[in-house]
Amino acid sequence: MEGIDMIEKFNGIIYLIVFIVHFLGYAFYAYRCVFKTQDFCDEYAVDHTAAIMIRFFGSFFIGSVLVALYIMFIRPNGVEGAWGFFNLVFVQNLTAFFVGIYSIKINKLGHTEKTSDEGIYAPGILMILSAILCYGLADKIYS
């Protein structure tokens, strides 16, 4: 019965899956930035002296994942009235997408042979997923 309640809180299984996929993406980057920092630096040819700032960046993902877990498992009303969180996540993804385009296609500061378009695609996908959530859960998050 509890699983059915969770599905209902998310307006159906589709939005619950989108929510889970989105925040699994956040958890993936949080883990890599905070706990696998050296591997992260090596993959993107970033000097290890940037580790503190990379972990700082990852901490924002951790905060969002913790709030998502709270909404999913603890918060009595689930997503109801959580418009601030969902809108903040969308705006963060949107700005990361545009900053990625600027950084990879326009400015090119710090480009190496390991530079890829991941800085555009990852936030672009996350932006689309968060937009789907804002739209699909609008009746609940704005109530």
In which residue ranges do the predicted regions lie?
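Juxtamembrane boundary at the C-terminal end of a transmembrane helix
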Residues: 132-143
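Core segments of alpha-helical transmembrane spans in multipass integral membrane proteins
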Residues: 24, 29, 51-73, 91-97
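Loop-to-transmembrane helix junctions at the membrane interface
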Residues: 75-89, 113-117
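Hydrophobic transmembrane helix segments
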Residues: 21-53
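Hydrophobic transmembrane alpha-helical segments in integral membrane proteins
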Residues: 2-25
